[in-house]
């Protein structure tokens, strides 16, 4: 009887020892199991935070870039005034304005086809450059078409009073275009660049007019051939 109780007691002790031994193992297992989960959760949170920060940095980087680009493309006073002139301009009949580069408003082409006078129906091409000091300084005008004219020399320089001493800041691009058209309608021999043509216009207007017609048909004047425009 005593021996049986002793054996039962030993078995209980062994079971308790096994339970105690198993308890740390279980706790260790939990620690091993839960530790990776906690680390994974922490890593996930860190990753989200990093992504959020990167997204924030990218946004401000983009805004800074846009601001920088906007600043670099800011129009200068000459461009603002030229844009205003063009917006308000009424192009005379027979004139057409074109831009090689739509982003460059300070350089453009002008074609003039007079509707009356000696140069009627011929088309003349001009290049116009607006200086950075505009409107305090006048536009620079070059005639790209070789023409027999008292106020335009054979190199394409144009003699127009408002492009020189008579220029004022209140004048505009439209005024210049109108002035160029007027040169073809009413050539001015009193302020010439082609002095031979101007003198002939004064001395013998009929011969001058004949020379103009001949030049527009691609003929020669003083051993110089002109392009055929009619």
UniProtKB/Swiss-Prot annotation:
Pfam families given in the database record: UQ_con
Broad class of enzyme this protein falls into: transferase
UniProtKB keywords: ATP-binding, Nucleotide-binding, Transferase, Ubl conjugation pathway
Active site: 159
Biological process, per Gene Ontology: protein modification process; protein neddylation
GO MF term list: ATP binding; NEDD8 conjugating enzyme activity; NEDD8 transferase activity; ubiquitin-protein transferase activity
General function of this protein: Accepts the ubiquitin-like protein nedd8 from the uba3-nae1 E1 complex and catalyzes its covalent attachment to other proteins.
Name of the protein in its database record: NEDD8-conjugating enzyme Ubc12
